[in-house]
C-alpha cells in the first residue's frame, strides 16, 4: 500500500514554515510514502520562488503543484525549467516554461502527478482541461497506474466534473485554489479518490489566508487595497490517500486538519485524527 499526503495551498511565510516544521512528524505519524503540496501562494501569498521551492523539497516534499499564480514571481519562469518537481498547470499552451506532470520512482514503485487548471471564473483561460487530461493520463498510464491529479479551480461543479471524467483512470483527483476545505471526500467507481478542495496551509483567523480588515473594506468601498498575509494560528489542511500500488486504485481517503505546532506543543483539533487512529487500531 502507498500512502500519499496531499496538502492544500500554502499561504505565505506562516504556511510554509508550518509545513516545513511539521512534515517530518506527519510523515512518521501517518506512514506517508509520498508528499504533494500546492505552493502557488507560498511567496507572500502570491507565487513561489526558487528558494522556497528548494526549502520545501529539502523538508521532504516530493512534488510541488501550483495554479494561476505560478508566474507571479518573475524569477520562476527561468527556475521552473531547472526543477522538474515544481509543476505548472499542464494545460498551458505549448512552449510555456516548465512541465505540468512528472513521474517519480519511489520504494513503492512509480508515482505520477499531474497539475491542471480549470477554466470557469479562472484567469488566464487555458486549454480545455478535459481534453488535455485525457491525453496526459493515457500517456502517463503507460508508465504507472498510480496517478494523482491536482485540479486547481474555482467552481465545485467543474472540479467534480473532472473528477467524474477521470474516475477509474487515475488514483486521486484532489482540488485546490479556494483555500476552503470541503467535506465531500469519497472514492468514485473505479477506485478514484476525490476531494473537491483540500483547503489551505495558512492562518485560520483570516479570509482565505489574508488579513481580514483590508478585504472587508475592499468589499465595502470597491477601492484598491493591499491584502497582507494574516498572522496568528496556522493549520495544515489536505488529504491522506491510501492507494494499492499494483492496481492504482484508491483504498481510502480522509481529510487532514493539523495544528501548525506539533502535538507535544499544541493540541490538534483531533476529530479526523482520532477517526484515523481508531480505524487503524480496528483494522
Task: Give, region by region, the residue ranges found by the protein language model.
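Acidic, metal/ion-coordinating pockets
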Residues: 1-283
Amino acid at each position: 500500500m502507498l500512502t500519499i499526503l496531499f496538502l492544500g495551498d500554502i499561504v505565505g511565510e506562516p504556511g510554509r514554515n508550518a509545513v516545513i516544521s511539521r512534515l517530518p512528524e506527519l510523515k512518521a505519524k501517518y506512514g506517508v510514502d509520498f508528499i504533494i503540496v500546492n505552493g502557488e501562494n507560498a511567496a507572500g501569498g502570491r507565487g513561489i520562488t526558487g528558494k522556497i521551492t528548494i526549502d520545501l523539497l529539502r523538508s521532504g516534499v516530493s512534488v510541488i503543484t501550483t495554479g494561476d499564480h505560478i508566474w507571479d514571481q518573475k524569477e520562476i519562469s527561468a527556475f521552473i525549467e531547472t526543477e522538474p518537481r515544481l509543476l505548472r498547470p499542464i494545460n498551458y499552451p505549448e512552449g510555456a516554461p516548465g512541465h505540468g506532470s512528472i513521474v517519480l520512482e519511489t520504494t513503492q514503485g512509480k508515482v505520477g502527478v499531474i497539475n491542471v487548471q480549470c477554466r470557469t471564473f479562472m484567469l488566464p483561460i487555458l486549454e480545455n482541461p478535459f481534453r488535455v487530461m485525457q491525453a496526459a493520463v493515457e500517456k502517463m498510464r503507460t508508465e504507472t497506474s498510480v496517478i494523482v491529479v491536482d485540479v486547481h479551480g474555482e467552481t465545485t461543479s467543474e472540479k467534480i466534473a473532472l473528477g467524474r471524467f477521470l474516475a477509474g483512470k487515475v488514483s486521486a483527483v484532489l482540488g485546490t485554489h479556494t483555500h476552503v476545505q470541503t467535506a465531500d471526500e469519497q472514492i468514485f467507481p473505479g477506485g478514484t479518490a476525490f476531494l473537491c478542495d483540500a483547503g489551505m496551509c495558512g492562518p485560520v483567523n483570516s479570509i482565505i489566508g489574508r488579513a481580514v480588515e483590508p478585504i472587508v473594506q475592499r468589499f465595502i468601498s470597491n477601492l484598491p487595497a493591499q491584502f497582507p498575509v494574516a498572522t496568528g494560528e496556522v493549520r495544515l489542511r489536505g488529504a491522506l490517500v491510501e492507494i494499492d500500488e499494483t492496481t492504482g486504485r484508491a483504498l481510502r481517503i480522509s481529510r487532514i486538519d493539523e495544528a501548525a505546532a506539533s502535538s507535544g506543543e499544541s493540541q490538534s483539533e483531533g476529530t479526523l485524527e482520532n477517526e484515523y487512529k481508531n480505524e487503524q487500531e480496528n483494522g
